[in-house]
Structures are given as C-alpha cells and as structure tokens.
C-alpha cells in the first residue's frame, strides 16, 4: 500500500503580532521569515516606531529555537532629510537579543545603476541566529537581482522569498516557516510550495483571508 503524502499545512491567525508572539512563545521546528511594518503602516510617530521595531525584532528572534534562524526583509526609508537604516536596526536588536548575523544580502528593487527617488532601490535580507553557524558557502547570491512577482505592493517578491525559505529548509532544517507580519501571504504560500508548513499572523481581516487563499507555484520561484 502506498503511503499518503499530506499537503503542507498553513495557519493564518488574525491578531496583533506583538501580543500574539508574547503569548505563543517559542515555536518548535520553526524558522522565521518576515518583514516588519514600516512607520507609514502603523499609527505611531518615528520615535515610538523605532522602539516598537526593535522590540518586534527581539520577539521574532525569541519565537524560534536558538539553533534556528530569523530572516528579515527590510527596506530603508528617508525621513526629514535623514536615512533610516532598517538593516542596522535589525542587527542592533538581534544582537541585543543574543543573536548574531549569519548573512546580509541585498535584494534589488530596481535594476542596478538606475536612479531612484523616494524609497531606496534595494532591500536588506538579513539572517540572524543565537546558536546556528552559517556554512562558509551558501547557494544564495550576495545580490538578488530578480525578486520575482510582488503579490502586494508591500510584499516581498516571490523569488526572494523562495531564497529565504530554501535557506530555512536546506540549511536550518526548519519544518515550519513563521511569518508574524504575513500580509497577503507571500511567505506562507512560498513555504507551502516548497513543502513546508507555515504559520502566519496578520492584523487585517481581508489580508488574512487573502493569506489563507494565496497559491504560489514552484515555477514562480
């Protein structure tokens, strides 16, 4: 008798991610792949958002086992003539939480050499862990030039998400991908496409429904 092969599972919880993570605690077998909301997406001034952001990074690191990893996609912003480096903020908060950087890659949002206005033309992809040691050689380019389709204006590209989830699966050995700010569900859908279970959290009811329904095919990755 042939064995039945079950499809990967997906849980999407409609909730505020901060109290949800505090209550849930560590998720066995999980690796986090996420993108924290920008100040423009939350009802806070810049100073309060900075504090919130740093605390959220620490909660994400706490949500996965020490030997696992947390991966962050973050795009810098400009405010009042100053550059807000979210990559530096992730590193600072992760180190304060007892983690260290495994790698820091760049995802191109625009073709290299093109002038950009407003938002920078690249996104940080940073992996951190408390105990994991990163392999010397990774099947992951330093600059990801094709991020893939964006399923939502604020979503990460599906190919970029695929790179992150493959790292979680092949290098970390994760069984579950956790995205506490899952939006319309790019990361959970990519995780399922690559054979992993996924847990997502999203405050918006509409985006929760989209996240539960979104399908990404392996051909898109």
Predicted segment positions?
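Core catalytic lobe of class I
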Residues: 2-208
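Conserved SAM-binding loop
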Residues: 211-212
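Conserved phosphoryl-transfer catalytic core
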Residues: 216, 221
């Amino acid at each position: 008798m042939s064995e039945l092969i079950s499809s990967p599972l997906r849980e999407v919880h409609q909730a505020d991610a901060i109290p949800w993570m505090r209550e849930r605690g560590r998720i066995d077998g999980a690796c986090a792949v996420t993108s924290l909301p920008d100040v423009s997406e939350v009802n806070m001034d810049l100073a309060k958002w900075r504090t919130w952001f740093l605390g959220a990074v620490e909660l994400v690191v706490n949500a996965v086992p020490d030997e696992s990893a947390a991966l962050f996609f973050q795009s810098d912003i400009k405010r009042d003539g100053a550059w807000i480096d979210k990559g530096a903020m992730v590193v600072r908060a992760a180190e304060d939480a007892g983690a260290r950087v495994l790698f820091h890659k760049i995802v191109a949002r625009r073709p290299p050499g093109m002038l950009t206005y407003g938002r920078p033309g690249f996104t940080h992809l940073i992996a951190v862990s408390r105990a994991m040691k990163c392999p010397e050689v990774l099947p992951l380019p330093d600059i990801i030039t094709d991020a893939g389709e964006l399923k939502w204006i604020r979503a990460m590209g599906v190919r970029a998400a695929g790179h992150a989830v493959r790292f979680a699966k092949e290098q970390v050995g994760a069984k579950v991908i956790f995205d506490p700010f899952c939006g319309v569900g790019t990361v959970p859908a990519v995780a399922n496409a690559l054979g992993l279970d996924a847990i997502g959290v999203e405050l918006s009811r509409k985006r929760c429904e989209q996240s539960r329904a979104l399908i990404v095919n392996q051909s898109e990755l």
